[in-house]
Amino acid sequence: MPVSMAVCETANVVNAALRESLGGNSSAAGSSADQAKSGEESNGSLQNHIVANAKRILMAKIEYEEVPNYHESVLESLKSKYIVIKPGNPGAINGFGGKNNTGKVVGANGHDNNGARKQAEHPNNQSHHNNHNNHPHPTSNPNELPKPKRVLYPRENIRIGWKQSERKWQVGTGMINVGNTCYLNSTLQALLHIPALANWLVSEQAHLENCNVAESGGGCIVCAMAKTLLATQSNQSAVRPFLIYSKLKQICKHMVVGRQEDAHEFLRFLVEAMERAYLMRFRNYKELDQLVKETTPLGQIFGGYLRSEVRCLSCNHVSITFQHFQDLLLDIRKADTLEDAFEGHFSRERLEDMGYKCEGCKKKVSATKQFSLERAPITLCIQLKRFSMIGNKLTKQISFKPRIDLSKYAARSPAAQAQPLTYRLVSMVTHLGVSQHCGHYTAIGSTDTGSYYNFDDSYVRPIAMQSVCNTNAYIMFYELDLSQTASPAANRPNGMRLTNGHSTTPVPATTVSSPSPTRFIGPQLPPGGVNGYSNGNAQKTAIQFKQHHQQSQQNGFQLGTGKFQDTAKPPLVGAHAKGEANPAPTANGNKSSSTSSNNSSSSNHKSINQQQYLPISSEDEDSEDERTSRPSTVQLPSMPKMTDDHTEKPKSPVKIQAKTPIKTPLKSLVPYESASEEEEAPLPNPRKRRSGEDSSESDQESGQTNGHSKTNGSLTNGSASSSVHVNNSKLKTDAIDEIFKSLKKSADSDDDDDEEESSIQLTNGWHPQKQSQSQSKAPPSPKTPPSPAVIKSKTGIWKVTRNDEVDDIDDDDDEEEEATVKIQTPSKTHRNPFSSSKPSTDSPATPGAKRQKLLNGSPVKSHQQPRVGNGYQSEATSNGSTINELLKQSHRGYGSSVLSWNGKPAELEKETFELVCAKRIAGHGSVDGSDIVESSVAVNASSGSDSNDVVVIAVALLVDAREQRQRDLDDDEENEMDRGRQRKVKSGSAKGNNASNSTPGYNPFQEYEGQKRWNKNGGGGGGFPRFYNQNFRQNFQQRNKFKFNRFGGPGGAKFQQQRALQRHLAAGGGFSRRQPSAQQQQQQS
């Protein structure tokens, strides 16, 4: 071992004697030197001085110590004076001895350097003392992370991921709780399901065989962990972790067997015990410095380094230090997500005012402090601060994602920028309870197949990813995801082999490159570019694109836009063309040029295909979905070019009429779809159809919205003549109104355009209303969609219809009405339910045949006056199957009725028979329905119908009106039970075996509210109302005793008949037309 004495250069006795002899008398020494050089005089006087001084020096006691080399003896003491280097000093040599603005020579840390001028005058002397700065050494640059002198376990030997091991990994068995050891079981399960740690433990087979630590026959703590891992992999039943449980006192002295402990505290002591056990393999482990001790396998797996920058607010002096960590403790008091907690941890914080002593100012000043990742760990351990010092627990829900990216928290150093920072969730520890001293710990771990399992002591069960993300986590383990950060060898010569934090300078990403000579004609997309964005290198992966994008944002660069066009073409100019690259339009797909709801289905399919190449993460997609931007679609040479104009017509080979721009994006509250799966047709706006005028006779094709018609995913001008006028009224921005777009057409009074009229196929048996010229001055009537909306839900496909339609019961003689109106009906095809069809000729047909054609989808002409029924129109004549078809399409008994799309009843007038009926259904008008009868008689007087038919119609309308009022007044708790997803079955009695003895209005869903069963003496109440019937429970009577007073008071077969009809309809059965009894005719008359 080399020896260096404490006196350094004076160790040589001869040299010391010479210096002391010559230094005693400068003049004599100078003359003696001259005499010695010239050789003219003898050197006797010099010898005398040397002998005298040598004797004294040899007799002096010299203290020395053994050191490895000269640097650690002398230069290590000097290193403490130059810990901090002042950045941005161009005049400094190697960061030392530079001049500041005032001309004062300062050191690297901002202090006065008295020896700086001397070192500058004697560069050789400086290079001698600072020789260690001229070659790689732990103190090469204090602004960089120092390298350890010795690496105990190379970082490159850590195998990341389950696939890196040749072993076939199993899910693992549970662990038996031997008495308040759930914290130990859950911590062990979380650790053993970390791939990097499990692979290292399996690789310690040689140490297991030769372990010389005999502690209770189980070896060291590392051997105990490895044996526990092998036991969980090989056994079929739950194991007892006695090897770890027996060493609890060795792991932590203050932990008591059988007492509940904190899982994170046990985790920290367990990892430290494993590190100590590994260091004991080396003889001089106590003499190792801290940097070397941090290179153990546990330190390489869990260890990382944080860069701490403290900036003085007075002189802007920055003090940089590095801190080793094995877990991040995140404060969640002001965070709702894991990203918020990271933002708070790595944000710049202000220290206590006048509480930091600046090394440059030499006084206490205000300063700021900020952390950044200098070297990220392979396995990131995150502990959420849920417990306080007194044991209270913060039980708030913190949402997190299975994959996180920490690249924005990396330090601004080359070594930090070159490392991968994409992590995936591998295991976690959860706590159930209200405090630290009680509760239960469980663990969640991943397997080599990517699935997750919940480990609750000895119970092991699979768990879904959604449940994992909704877990109230306490400790989380994320591991580097090499599959997401793998890059070509051109940028990283060593592949993904992790260095010790000091790798070569990464190749800078180029954002502009020469265009590819190949021009793609088809809809293909290269891996490098999406939606007009391209990083100029087709062989780079998606994660590289994101990293380059983030770096370009920091450096102020902008990504180029190729768009499969020639280089001479200008780049895309949009809302995102600013000082930084913004791939927001790529996240939410391609939008239409007017940002309206008239998006073609082809662009929607294109956006779905393009999202497969998106280079940004899912969280960016979620946040960017709400933005509205100009189009950034890929323009191919074979595709029509569209401009970014929002108001004018785009220049395109296809005639396109872009109109009605909407500033707010279209957001659907429910997934409405048309009857065809291939295209989505816009639905009318209820506010527009209330405020707009009636649609008169026009010669345009159906399915047009604001003058367009959807044809094969593109907007084409589908109007047939110039008589179509688009109403440019103000668009409504209500949330519900955004779902619909109405068709407003002005009235056209020409009678000679019968040959140009297009008959439209009936959808679900409904006709849109069309009034004749004589009724053109009538008050506006509602405009209705051709077909009910189709809703896709988890329970199936639903159609939204009204449950209070008008049940028409007319005879076959009503086909001879005077008012002949030609109805325009939408034709439904397999491609577009709103597309038009050729005009059909007028052919008379019987009502039965006409109804059959309507049901089969054939376009016909209607010669009858259409009737309005609560916002929908139906034909005036029908056969006996009309009501059955209506009842089959209705949703009676499925919940509360839908009055209109905005929740309000339709505003209809009373001037026609249909409007009066709608008022009846909405609950207006007289109680006995006399005005309905009068209106029906007045309307049908000219048709020559029998009075019996009129009475039948009036009775049916009155019954339906009463049913609607009854449904509107049902208890809220009945409607809130299932929200219409399950059909309510109303049986007649407690046993439900006799429909004749059924109690009106009884609902089995309300049985849980009653405490006693009603009597079984059954039977109806004769002529008494329901609240006089003794078969009802008292609480049921109390809630419903005021509901039926407005039906005419007690008594009467009229009430019983009405209730019987309601029970029949509620049971789901249809009913055929029946002749009214004489008693009913007498009551109605």
Swiss-Prot record:
Higher taxonomy: Eukaryota, Metazoa, Ecdysozoa, Arthropoda, Hexapoda
Compartmental location: Nucleus, Nucleolus
Any one Gene Ontology molecular-function term assigned to this protein's record: cysteine-type deubiquitinase activity
Task performed by this protein: Required for maintaining multiple types of adult stem cells, including male and female germline, epithelial follicle cell and intestinal stem cells. May function as a transcriptional repressor by continually deubiquiting histone H2B at the promoters of genes critical for cellular differentiation, thereby preventing histone H3 'Lys-4' trimethylation (H3K4). Controls selective autophagy activation by ubiquitinated proteins.
Sequence ranges of Low complexity compositional bias: 23-36, 503-518, 588-609, 768-778, 987-998, 1056-1066
Sequence ranges of Basic and acidic residues compositional bias: 642-651
Residues the record lists as Phosphoserine modifications: S514, S516, S674, S676, S749, S781, S787, S843
Residues found modified as Phosphothreonine: T660, T664, T784, T825, T846
Family statement: Belongs to the peptidase C19 family.
Protein name: Ubiquitin carboxyl-terminal hydrolase 36
Main location: nucleus
Biased composition (Polar residues): 532-542, 705-730, 822-844, 859-884
InterPro entries noted in UniProt: Papain-like_cys_pep_sf (IPR038765), Peptidase_C19 (IPR050164), Peptidase_C19_UCH (IPR001394), USP_CS (IPR018200), USP_dom (IPR028889)
Region (Disordered): 23-47, 104-149, 489-730, 745-888, 963-1030, 1043-1085
GO cellular component: cytosol; nucleolus
USP domain mapped to chain residues: 173-481
Catalytic activities: Thiol-dependent hydrolysis of ester, thioester, amide, peptide and isopeptide bonds formed by the C-terminal Gly of ubiquitin (a 76-residue protein attached to proteins as an intracellular targeting signal)
